[in-house]
Amino acid sequence: MLDTVAPGPDIDVLMNDIGRKAKAAARPLGFASTEAKNSALNAMADAILANKAHILAENAKDLKDIEGTEMLASFVDRLTLNDKRVAEMAEGIRAIAALADPVGEVIAAWDRPNGLKIERVRTPLGVIGVIFESRPNVTADAGALCLKAGNAVILRCGSDSRRSSQAIHACLVKGLKAAGLPEHAIQLVPVTDRAAVGAMLRGLDGAIDVIVPRGGKSLVARVQSEARVPVFAHLEGLCHIYVDASADIEMAKKIIVNAKMRRTGICGAVETLLVDGAAIGTHLTPLLEALTDAGCEIRASPTVLKVAPGMKPATEEDWSTEYLDAIISVAVVDGISGAIAHIQTYSSNHTEAVIAEDPDVVARFFTEVDSAILLHNASTQFADGGEFGMGAEIGIATGKMHARGPVGVEQLTSFKYRVHGAGQTRP
Protein backbone atom coordinates (compact mmCIF):
# COMPACT_ATOMS: atom_id res chain seq x y z
CA MET A 1 0.00 0.00 0.00
CA LEU A 2 1.23 3.51 -0.73
CA ASP A 3 2.20 5.64 2.22
CA THR A 4 -0.11 8.48 3.13
CA VAL A 5 0.76 11.98 4.24
CA ALA A 6 -1.66 14.40 5.87
CA PRO A 7 -2.83 17.20 3.57
CA GLY A 8 -1.38 20.65 4.01
CA PRO A 9 2.17 22.02 4.02
CA ASP A 10 3.67 18.51 4.27
CA ILE A 11 2.31 17.74 0.80
CA ASP A 12 4.06 20.76 -0.70
CA VAL A 13 7.32 19.81 1.02
CA LEU A 14 7.03 16.23 -0.25
CA MET A 15 6.12 17.23 -3.80
CA ASN A 16 8.80 19.90 -4.13
CA ASP A 17 11.37 17.34 -2.97
CA ILE A 18 10.12 14.94 -5.65
CA GLY A 19 10.44 17.76 -8.18
CA ARG A 20 14.02 18.54 -7.16
CA LYS A 21 14.99 14.88 -7.43
CA ALA A 22 13.38 14.61 -10.87
CA LYS A 23 15.15 17.72 -12.12
CA ALA A 24 18.47 16.44 -10.83
CA ALA A 25 17.89 13.07 -12.53
CA ALA A 26 16.87 14.73 -15.80
CA ARG A 27 20.31 16.31 -16.28
CA PRO A 28 22.39 13.12 -16.67
CA LEU A 29 19.46 11.35 -18.31
CA GLY A 30 19.40 13.98 -21.06
CA PHE A 31 22.75 12.79 -22.39
CA ALA A 32 22.62 9.14 -21.28
CA SER A 33 23.70 6.73 -23.99
CA THR A 34 21.19 4.87 -26.10
CA GLU A 35 22.73 1.64 -24.84
CA ALA A 36 22.16 2.56 -21.20
CA LYS A 37 18.56 3.58 -21.80
CA ASN A 38 17.79 0.43 -23.79
CA SER A 39 19.48 -1.73 -21.16
CA ALA A 40 17.26 -0.16 -18.50
CA LEU A 41 14.14 -0.67 -20.60
CA ASN A 42 14.85 -4.34 -21.26
CA ALA A 43 15.62 -4.88 -17.58
CA MET A 44 12.28 -3.25 -16.73
CA ALA A 45 10.46 -5.63 -19.07
CA ASP A 46 12.27 -8.59 -17.48
CA ALA A 47 11.33 -7.38 -14.00
CA ILE A 48 7.67 -6.98 -14.93
CA LEU A 49 7.50 -10.56 -16.22
CA ALA A 50 9.41 -11.89 -13.22
CA ASN A 51 7.05 -10.09 -10.85
CA LYS A 52 3.84 -10.84 -12.74
CA ALA A 53 2.27 -12.77 -9.85
CA HIS A 54 2.86 -9.88 -7.45
CA ILE A 55 1.54 -7.30 -9.93
CA LEU A 56 -1.64 -9.33 -10.48
CA ALA A 57 -2.10 -9.87 -6.75
CA GLU A 58 -1.87 -6.12 -6.11
CA ASN A 59 -4.25 -5.47 -9.00
CA ALA A 60 -6.74 -7.91 -7.46
CA LYS A 61 -6.64 -5.81 -4.28
CA ASP A 62 -7.35 -2.65 -6.29
CA LEU A 63 -10.29 -4.38 -7.95
CA LYS A 64 -11.60 -5.61 -4.60
CA ASP A 65 -11.56 -2.04 -3.29
CA ILE A 66 -14.12 -0.97 -5.90
CA GLU A 67 -16.46 -3.93 -5.39
CA GLY A 68 -19.95 -2.73 -4.61
CA THR A 69 -19.35 0.70 -6.15
CA GLU A 70 -21.24 1.93 -9.19
CA MET A 71 -18.25 1.96 -11.52
CA LEU A 72 -18.87 1.64 -15.25
CA ALA A 73 -17.77 -1.59 -16.88
CA SER A 74 -15.35 0.48 -18.98
CA PHE A 75 -13.71 1.81 -15.80
CA VAL A 76 -13.28 -1.70 -14.40
CA ASP A 77 -11.86 -2.86 -17.74
CA ARG A 78 -9.24 -0.09 -17.73
CA LEU A 79 -8.22 -0.98 -14.18
CA THR A 80 -8.05 -4.74 -14.76
CA LEU A 81 -4.76 -6.52 -15.44
CA ASN A 82 -4.37 -10.16 -16.46
CA ASP A 83 -1.63 -12.42 -17.81
CA LYS A 84 -2.10 -11.13 -21.35
CA ARG A 85 -2.06 -7.46 -20.38
CA VAL A 86 1.04 -7.85 -18.21
CA ALA A 87 2.79 -9.62 -21.09
CA GLU A 88 1.71 -6.82 -23.43
CA MET A 89 3.07 -4.28 -20.96
CA ALA A 90 6.49 -5.92 -21.07
CA GLU A 91 6.33 -6.27 -24.85
CA GLY A 92 5.46 -2.58 -25.13
CA ILE A 93 8.56 -1.62 -23.14
CA ARG A 94 10.74 -3.82 -25.35
CA ALA A 95 9.17 -2.20 -28.42
CA ILE A 96 10.14 1.21 -27.05
CA ALA A 97 13.69 -0.04 -26.50
CA ALA A 98 13.78 -1.11 -30.15
CA LEU A 99 12.82 2.37 -31.38
CA ALA A 100 15.43 4.77 -32.68
CA ASP A 101 16.72 7.14 -30.01
CA PRO A 102 15.30 10.59 -30.82
CA VAL A 103 17.77 12.50 -28.64
CA GLY A 104 20.50 14.11 -30.73
CA GLU A 105 18.73 13.46 -34.03
CA VAL A 106 19.41 16.21 -36.58
CA ILE A 107 15.93 17.04 -37.89
CA ALA A 108 16.99 19.87 -40.22
CA ALA A 109 20.26 21.32 -41.47
CA TRP A 110 21.16 24.15 -43.82
CA ASP A 111 24.03 26.43 -44.82
CA ARG A 112 23.86 30.21 -44.81
CA PRO A 113 25.50 32.42 -47.47
CA ASN A 114 27.96 33.65 -44.84
CA GLY A 115 29.21 30.11 -44.29
CA LEU A 116 27.36 29.36 -41.04
CA LYS A 117 26.15 25.78 -40.83
CA ILE A 118 22.92 25.45 -38.83
CA GLU A 119 21.39 22.27 -37.41
CA ARG A 120 18.13 21.75 -35.54
CA VAL A 121 18.61 18.88 -33.09
CA ARG A 122 16.17 16.96 -30.87
CA THR A 123 16.59 17.39 -27.12
CA PRO A 124 14.63 16.07 -24.12
CA LEU A 125 11.84 18.20 -22.69
CA GLY A 126 13.18 17.73 -19.16
CA VAL A 127 10.68 16.61 -16.50
CA ILE A 128 7.24 15.30 -17.47
CA GLY A 129 4.38 15.13 -14.99
CA VAL A 130 1.83 12.41 -15.73
CA ILE A 131 -1.46 12.39 -13.81
CA PHE A 132 -3.67 9.36 -14.43
CA GLU A 133 -6.61 7.50 -12.95
CA SER A 134 -7.61 3.90 -13.53
CA ARG A 135 -4.95 2.74 -15.99
CA PRO A 136 -2.06 1.01 -14.18
CA ASN A 137 -0.41 0.26 -17.53
CA VAL A 138 0.24 4.01 -17.88
CA THR A 139 2.91 3.56 -15.19
CA ALA A 140 4.93 1.36 -17.54
CA ASP A 141 4.10 3.15 -20.80
CA ALA A 142 4.83 6.65 -19.50
CA GLY A 143 7.93 5.63 -17.59
CA ALA A 144 9.42 3.84 -20.60
CA LEU A 145 8.56 6.52 -23.16
CA CYS A 146 9.93 9.34 -21.02
CA LEU A 147 13.13 7.42 -20.35
CA LYS A 148 13.69 6.70 -24.05
CA ALA A 149 13.28 10.40 -24.83
CA GLY A 150 15.75 11.33 -22.08
CA ASN A 151 13.15 12.79 -19.73
CA ALA A 152 12.57 12.27 -16.04
CA VAL A 153 8.93 11.61 -15.13
CA ILE A 154 6.76 12.11 -12.06
CA LEU A 155 3.77 9.75 -12.04
CA ARG A 156 0.68 10.42 -9.98
CA CYS A 157 -1.83 7.57 -10.14
CA GLY A 158 -5.40 7.61 -8.89
CA SER A 159 -6.31 5.91 -5.63
CA ASP A 160 -8.11 3.19 -7.60
CA SER A 161 -4.88 1.92 -9.23
CA ARG A 162 -2.38 2.71 -6.49
CA ARG A 163 -1.35 -0.84 -5.55
CA SER A 164 -1.01 -1.99 -9.16
CA SER A 165 0.95 1.12 -10.08
CA GLN A 166 3.29 0.76 -7.13
CA ALA A 167 4.06 -2.85 -8.06
CA ILE A 168 4.82 -1.87 -11.66
CA HIS A 169 6.86 1.16 -10.58
CA ALA A 170 9.09 -1.05 -8.43
CA CYS A 171 9.98 -3.00 -11.59
CA LEU A 172 10.87 0.21 -13.43
CA VAL A 173 13.20 1.28 -10.62
CA LYS A 174 14.92 -2.11 -10.78
CA GLY A 175 15.58 -1.52 -14.46
CA LEU A 176 17.04 1.94 -13.84
CA LYS A 177 19.36 0.63 -11.13
CA ALA A 178 20.47 -2.32 -13.27
CA ALA A 179 21.57 0.08 -16.02
CA GLY A 180 23.23 2.54 -13.66
CA LEU A 181 20.74 5.32 -14.37
CA PRO A 182 19.32 7.64 -11.68
CA GLU A 183 16.53 5.87 -9.81
CA HIS A 184 14.68 9.17 -9.41
CA ALA A 185 14.29 9.38 -13.18
CA ILE A 186 10.92 7.65 -12.72
CA GLN A 187 9.09 8.55 -9.51
CA LEU A 188 5.62 7.58 -8.33
CA VAL A 189 3.94 10.08 -6.01
CA PRO A 190 3.49 8.13 -2.74
CA VAL A 191 0.25 9.82 -1.67
CA THR A 192 -3.31 9.82 -2.94
CA ASP A 193 -4.17 13.25 -1.53
CA ARG A 194 -5.50 15.49 -4.31
CA ALA A 195 -3.31 18.31 -3.06
CA ALA A 196 -0.46 16.47 -4.79
CA VAL A 197 -2.19 17.06 -8.12
CA GLY A 198 -2.49 20.76 -7.38
CA ALA A 199 1.20 20.93 -6.53
CA MET A 200 2.10 19.28 -9.84
CA LEU A 201 -0.12 21.66 -11.78
CA ARG A 202 1.75 24.56 -10.20
CA GLY A 203 4.96 23.09 -11.61
CA LEU A 204 6.76 22.04 -8.40
CA ASP A 205 8.77 25.24 -8.16
CA GLY A 206 9.79 25.15 -11.81
CA ALA A 207 10.72 21.46 -11.91
CA ILE A 208 7.97 20.24 -14.29
CA ASP A 209 8.18 21.18 -17.97
CA VAL A 210 5.03 19.48 -19.31
CA ILE A 211 1.93 17.88 -17.77
CA VAL A 212 0.11 14.94 -19.38
CA PRO A 213 -3.27 13.93 -17.88
CA ARG A 214 -4.73 10.48 -18.58
CA GLY A 215 -8.23 10.08 -17.22
CA GLY A 216 -11.82 11.23 -17.26
CA LYS A 217 -13.23 14.51 -18.45
CA SER A 218 -13.24 16.11 -15.00
CA LEU A 219 -9.55 15.35 -14.41
CA VAL A 220 -8.48 16.65 -17.81
CA ALA A 221 -10.66 19.75 -17.47
CA ARG A 222 -9.09 20.51 -14.10
CA VAL A 223 -5.59 20.08 -15.48
CA GLN A 224 -6.27 22.32 -18.47
CA SER A 225 -7.86 24.95 -16.23
CA GLU A 226 -5.30 25.05 -13.43
CA ALA A 227 -1.96 24.08 -14.98
CA ARG A 228 0.77 26.69 -15.00
CA VAL A 229 2.91 24.61 -17.34
CA PRO A 230 2.17 23.36 -20.89
CA VAL A 231 -0.31 20.46 -21.17
CA PHE A 232 -0.53 17.62 -23.71
CA ALA A 233 -4.10 16.35 -23.43
CA HIS A 234 -7.49 15.61 -24.90
CA LEU A 235 -10.67 16.39 -23.00
CA GLU A 236 -12.62 13.43 -24.38
CA GLY A 237 -12.69 11.04 -27.32
CA LEU A 238 -15.90 11.94 -29.12
CA CYS A 239 -15.09 9.99 -32.29
CA HIS A 240 -17.20 9.84 -35.47
CA ILE A 241 -17.44 7.52 -38.45
CA TYR A 242 -19.02 8.72 -41.70
CA VAL A 243 -20.29 6.03 -44.09
CA ASP A 244 -20.54 7.37 -47.62
CA ALA A 245 -22.88 5.98 -50.28
CA SER A 246 -19.79 4.70 -52.08
CA ALA A 247 -18.74 2.57 -49.10
CA ASP A 248 -18.48 -1.20 -49.32
CA ILE A 249 -21.24 -2.30 -46.93
CA GLU A 250 -19.51 -5.46 -45.69
CA MET A 251 -16.36 -3.49 -44.93
CA ALA A 252 -18.41 -0.79 -43.21
CA LYS A 253 -20.18 -3.29 -40.95
CA LYS A 254 -16.92 -4.92 -39.91
CA ILE A 255 -15.18 -1.61 -39.21
CA ILE A 256 -18.04 -0.04 -37.25
CA VAL A 257 -18.65 -3.04 -35.00
CA ASN A 258 -14.93 -3.16 -34.23
CA ALA A 259 -14.70 0.60 -33.68
CA LYS A 260 -17.55 0.50 -31.17
CA MET A 261 -17.44 -2.90 -29.52
CA ARG A 262 -13.81 -4.10 -29.44
CA ARG A 263 -13.22 -2.03 -26.29
CA THR A 264 -15.99 0.41 -25.50
CA GLY A 265 -14.12 2.21 -22.73
CA ILE A 266 -11.16 3.62 -24.66
CA CYS A 267 -10.91 7.09 -26.13
CA GLY A 268 -10.68 5.72 -29.68
CA ALA A 269 -14.08 4.00 -29.52
CA VAL A 270 -16.55 5.50 -31.99
CA GLU A 271 -19.47 7.30 -30.35
CA THR A 272 -21.40 8.63 -33.38
CA LEU A 273 -22.18 6.99 -36.72
CA LEU A 274 -23.11 9.27 -39.62
CA VAL A 275 -24.71 7.67 -42.69
CA ASP A 276 -24.98 9.32 -46.09
CA GLY A 277 -28.60 10.17 -46.89
CA ALA A 278 -28.08 8.70 -50.35
CA ALA A 279 -27.37 5.33 -48.70
CA ILE A 280 -30.47 5.01 -46.50
CA GLY A 281 -31.91 2.24 -48.65
CA THR A 282 -28.67 0.27 -48.99
CA HIS A 283 -26.49 0.86 -45.95
CA LEU A 284 -28.50 2.06 -42.95
CA THR A 285 -30.46 -1.07 -42.02
CA PRO A 286 -27.50 -3.48 -42.38
CA LEU A 287 -25.37 -1.20 -40.20
CA LEU A 288 -28.06 -0.94 -37.51
CA GLU A 289 -28.54 -4.70 -37.53
CA ALA A 290 -24.79 -5.35 -37.25
CA LEU A 291 -24.52 -3.06 -34.23
CA THR A 292 -27.64 -4.46 -32.56
CA ASP A 293 -26.49 -8.04 -33.12
CA ALA A 294 -23.19 -7.13 -31.45
CA GLY A 295 -25.05 -5.96 -28.34
CA CYS A 296 -24.87 -2.22 -28.96
CA GLU A 297 -27.68 0.15 -27.94
CA ILE A 298 -28.57 2.71 -30.62
CA ARG A 299 -29.66 6.31 -30.06
CA ALA A 300 -31.37 7.25 -33.31
CA SER A 301 -32.00 10.57 -35.06
CA PRO A 302 -35.54 11.27 -36.39
CA THR A 303 -34.59 10.10 -39.89
CA VAL A 304 -33.12 6.88 -38.54
CA LEU A 305 -36.27 6.30 -36.46
CA LYS A 306 -38.35 6.33 -39.63
CA VAL A 307 -36.36 3.34 -40.85
CA ALA A 308 -36.06 1.66 -37.44
CA PRO A 309 -38.92 2.91 -35.23
CA GLY A 310 -38.00 0.59 -32.36
CA MET A 311 -34.76 2.41 -31.61
CA LYS A 312 -34.32 4.83 -28.71
CA PRO A 313 -34.59 8.46 -29.88
CA ALA A 314 -31.40 10.51 -29.65
CA THR A 315 -31.46 13.74 -27.68
CA GLU A 316 -29.32 16.81 -28.35
CA GLU A 317 -27.08 15.70 -25.48
CA ASP A 318 -26.35 12.38 -27.19
CA TRP A 319 -24.44 14.07 -30.02
CA SER A 320 -21.93 15.47 -27.53
CA THR A 321 -21.69 12.43 -25.24
CA GLU A 322 -18.66 10.17 -24.91
CA TYR A 323 -20.50 7.02 -23.82
CA LEU A 324 -17.52 4.75 -23.08
CA ASP A 325 -20.13 2.00 -23.20
CA ALA A 326 -21.97 -0.20 -25.70
CA ILE A 327 -24.05 2.75 -26.93
CA ILE A 328 -23.80 4.68 -30.20
CA SER A 329 -25.62 7.67 -31.68
CA VAL A 330 -26.69 7.29 -35.32
CA ALA A 331 -27.73 10.07 -37.69
CA VAL A 332 -28.38 10.44 -41.40
CA VAL A 333 -26.55 13.37 -43.00
CA ASP A 334 -26.58 15.13 -46.36
CA GLY A 335 -23.49 13.52 -47.84
CA ILE A 336 -19.94 14.54 -47.05
CA SER A 337 -20.97 18.18 -46.50
CA GLY A 338 -23.46 17.16 -43.82
CA ALA A 339 -20.93 14.83 -42.19
CA ILE A 340 -18.28 17.54 -42.00
CA ALA A 341 -20.79 20.04 -40.59
CA HIS A 342 -21.88 17.58 -37.88
CA ILE A 343 -18.29 16.73 -36.96
CA GLN A 344 -17.30 20.40 -36.79
CA THR A 345 -20.21 21.03 -34.43
CA TYR A 346 -19.77 18.14 -32.00
CA SER A 347 -16.26 16.69 -32.38
CA SER A 348 -13.64 16.78 -29.64
CA ASN A 349 -10.98 16.78 -32.42
CA HIS A 350 -9.66 13.38 -31.37
CA THR A 351 -10.31 10.80 -34.12
CA GLU A 352 -12.70 10.58 -37.08
CA ALA A 353 -13.03 8.02 -39.86
CA VAL A 354 -14.56 7.95 -43.33
CA ILE A 355 -15.65 4.73 -45.02
CA ALA A 356 -15.83 5.39 -48.75
CA GLU A 357 -14.56 4.25 -52.12
CA ASP A 358 -14.99 7.67 -53.76
CA PRO A 359 -11.52 9.33 -53.70
CA ASP A 360 -13.02 12.82 -53.89
CA VAL A 361 -15.04 12.17 -50.71
CA VAL A 362 -11.95 10.88 -48.92
CA ALA A 363 -9.83 13.82 -50.08
CA ARG A 364 -12.41 16.34 -48.89
CA PHE A 365 -12.78 14.58 -45.53
CA PHE A 366 -9.02 14.59 -44.98
CA THR A 367 -8.72 18.24 -46.02
CA GLU A 368 -11.64 19.78 -44.14
CA VAL A 369 -11.90 17.77 -40.92
CA ASP A 370 -9.46 19.17 -38.35
CA SER A 371 -9.07 16.36 -35.85
CA ALA A 372 -5.77 14.96 -34.62
CA ILE A 373 -6.28 11.56 -36.29
CA LEU A 374 -8.20 10.86 -39.50
CA LEU A 375 -8.70 7.36 -40.91
CA HIS A 376 -9.98 6.03 -44.22
CA ASN A 377 -11.55 2.57 -44.32
CA ALA A 378 -10.16 1.61 -40.90
CA SER A 379 -11.40 1.39 -37.32
CA THR A 380 -11.08 4.38 -35.00
CA GLN A 381 -9.59 1.99 -32.45
CA PHE A 382 -6.30 2.27 -34.35
CA ALA A 383 -5.93 5.68 -32.65
CA ASP A 384 -3.13 4.37 -30.49
CA GLY A 385 0.60 4.97 -30.32
CA GLY A 386 1.38 1.26 -30.35
CA GLU A 387 -0.67 0.80 -33.52
CA PHE A 388 1.18 3.76 -35.06
CA GLY A 389 4.50 2.00 -34.51
CA MET A 390 5.49 4.25 -31.60
CA GLY A 391 5.90 1.33 -29.18
CA ALA A 392 3.33 2.92 -26.88
CA GLU A 393 1.91 6.34 -26.15
CA ILE A 394 1.84 8.59 -23.14
CA GLY A 395 -1.52 9.93 -24.30
CA ILE A 396 -3.41 11.46 -27.22
CA ALA A 397 -3.09 15.21 -27.69
CA THR A 398 -5.78 17.17 -29.53
CA GLY A 399 -4.33 20.67 -29.15
CA LYS A 400 -2.32 22.55 -31.75
CA MET A 401 1.09 22.28 -30.08
CA HIS A 402 3.87 20.23 -31.67
CA ALA A 403 2.55 17.09 -29.95
CA ARG A 404 -0.74 16.14 -31.66
CA GLY A 405 -2.31 12.70 -31.90
CA PRO A 406 -0.47 9.84 -30.15
CA VAL A 407 2.31 11.24 -27.98
CA GLY A 408 5.33 8.98 -28.39
CA VAL A 409 9.06 9.40 -27.93
CA GLU A 410 9.53 11.99 -30.68
CA GLN A 411 6.70 14.14 -29.31
CA LEU A 412 8.38 14.06 -25.88
CA THR A 413 11.33 16.04 -27.24
CA SER A 414 12.03 19.67 -28.00
CA PHE A 415 14.96 20.95 -30.06
CA LYS A 416 17.90 23.29 -30.02
CA TYR A 417 20.01 24.88 -32.74
CA ARG A 418 23.67 24.09 -33.26
CA VAL A 419 25.46 26.71 -35.34
CA HIS A 420 28.96 25.98 -36.69
CA GLY A 421 31.10 28.88 -37.78
CA ALA A 422 34.63 29.62 -38.93
CA GLY A 423 35.26 32.99 -37.34
CA GLN A 424 32.22 34.84 -38.73
CA THR A 425 31.24 38.15 -37.12
CA ARG A 426 28.04 40.02 -37.80
CA PRO A 427 28.47 43.24 -39.83
Swiss-Prot record:
Xref: PANTHER family: DELTA-1-PYRROLINE-5-CARBOXYLATE SYNTHASE, GLUTAMATE SEMIALDEHYDE DEHYDROGENASE
InterPro entries: Ald_DH/histidinol_DH (IPR016161), Ald_DH_C (IPR016163), Ald_DH_N (IPR016162), Aldehyde_DH_dom (IPR015590), G-glutamylP_reductase_CS (IPR020593), Glu-5-SA_DH (IPR012134), GPR_dom (IPR000965)
Keywords: Amino-acid biosynthesis, Cytoplasm, NADP, Oxidoreductase, Proline biosynthesis
UniProt keyword Amino-acid biosynthesis present: yes
Alphabetical GO biological process terms: L-proline biosynthetic process
Native source species: Rhizobium johnstonii (strain DSM 114642 / LMG 32736 / 3841)
Places the protein is found: Cytoplasm
UniProt entry tagged with the keyword NADP: yes
Coiled coil location: none
Protein name: Gamma-glutamyl phosphate reductase
Function, as annotated: Catalyzes the NADPH-dependent reduction of L-glutamate 5-phosphate into L-glutamate 5-semialdehyde and phosphate. The product spontaneously undergoes cyclization to form 1-pyrroline-5-carboxylate.
Gene of this entry: proA
Pfam families: Aldedh
Similarity comment text for this entry: Belongs to the gamma-glutamyl phosphate reductase family.
